[in-house]
From Swiss-Prot:
Its EC number is 5.1.1.1. SMART domains: Ala_racemase_C (SM01005). This is Alanine racemase. Transmembrane segments: none annotated. Signal peptide: none annotated. Disulfide bonds: none annotated. Catalyzes the interconversion of L-alanine and D-alanine. May also act on other amino acids. The modification N6-(pyridoxal phosphate)lysine is found at K33.
Length: 328
């Protein structure tokens, strides 16, 4: 069976490095949405808790329930209000017109649109939003935003920072002791984090985004069969690869049904052990030079992201949750 290995020491190293940058584990919000970016939320939750993390963010109520035993505070980022929210959790308020649809007396964090224009309330409408919240029984405990271009060297990041500072100044006139968070993974290493803010960290906790961090996830496959591919013989659908000489090849138990991008046999896709994939990837398998019973498919998602002209996030979150994940 294919296997994902999670490097426990690397993960703990990364969290300590991030906490040092922020100032403490208490100001750290670990984002565990989408199965912790493919790494395995339930596997990593106790590690984060043991280091001192008490606040996490997830996508949905279902994700929150999976790890609620580990954390005091869980923020649900992408919730559609239905009137039966769980008071155990904190909910993001992404659209002020939805105030009346939430169950009353639950805790919310107000999302501010500082320039990404995806979710949230723009700064110009903030006082109106505050009035609506004050007229409800919702408990506003925090406010946050998301930087759209923190990893780009342009001025929009600084515009968004300034907009959030304006929003904080407004909301502080009406509420005290709110929890603020704007800095995400991309913004973490771009300057000093405001003293009154927490920091939400997503993919950076798994070793991406800073050269001082360590990759946490590695993907492995196991051999199904092996054979001698004779000179002139082809392998896989369409016979894209033809052997230039006799060679020993093997088929391994990982394919595009497992969440990998489908390799079409064109270009050189290098695996984690330096061997190239041979021929088109199948639904449940791929072939390469025989590399033993177990082969590392990748240790660095950036390599596959570059090959398929996408981002490392997409490579990781697509990994099938049914692939076994183990701590090493």
């Amino acid at each position: 069976m294919s296997l994902i290995k999670i490097d426990q020491k690397a993960y703990e190293y990364n969290l300590r490095h991030i906490a040092k940058k922020i100032g403490s584990f208490q100001r750290l919000i670990c984002v565990f949405k989408d199965n912790a970016y493919g790494h395995g939320a339930k596997l990593l939750a106790p590690l984060a808790k043991n280091l001192g993390v008490s606040f996490v963010a997830v996508k949905s109520e279902e994700e929150a329930r999976e790890i609620e035993e580990f954390f005091e505070n869980i923020l649900i980022l992408s919730h559609r209000p239905h009137g039966n929210e769980n008071s155990r959790f904190i909910y993001a308020l992404n659209d002020i017109s939805q105030v009346k649809n939430y169950k009353q007396d639950i805790k919310i964090h107000l999302k501010i649109d500082t320039g990404m224009h995806r979710n949230g309330i723009c700064v110009e409408n903030l006082e109106h939003a505050i009035n609506l919240i004050q007229g409800s029984d919702l408990k506003l405990t925090g406010m946050f935003t998301h930087f759209a271009s923190a990893d780009e060297m342009d001025g929009s990041f600084f515009v968004q920072k300034e907009n959030f500072q304006k929003a904080k100044k407004i909301v502080k006139k009406y509420f005290s002791n709110l929890l603020f968070h704007s800095y995400n993974s991309a913004a973490l290493f771009r300057g000093k984090i405001p003293e009154d803010e927490y920091c939400r960290v997503g993919l950076v906790q798994f070793g991406y985004g800073d050269s001082n961090l360590k990759r946490v996830l590695s993907l492995y496959a196991h051999r199904l069969s092996q054979r001698i591919l004779q000179k002139g013989q082809s392998i896989g659908y369409g016979g894209i690869f033809t052997a230039a000489k006799d060679m020993e090849v093997a088929t391994y138990d990982l394919g595009y049904a497992d969440g990998l991008f489908r390799y079409n046999g064109r270009g050189e896709l290098v695996l984690g052990n330096g061997k190239a994939m041979l021929g088109k990837m199948s639904m449940d398998s791929f072939s390469c030079e025989n590399s033993g019973e177990e082969i590392c498919v990748f240790k660095d998602a950036d390599i596959w992201a570059d090959f398929f002209h996408t981002i490392n996030y997409e490579i990781l979150v697509k990994l099938n949750p049914n692939i076994q994940r183990v701590l090493v």
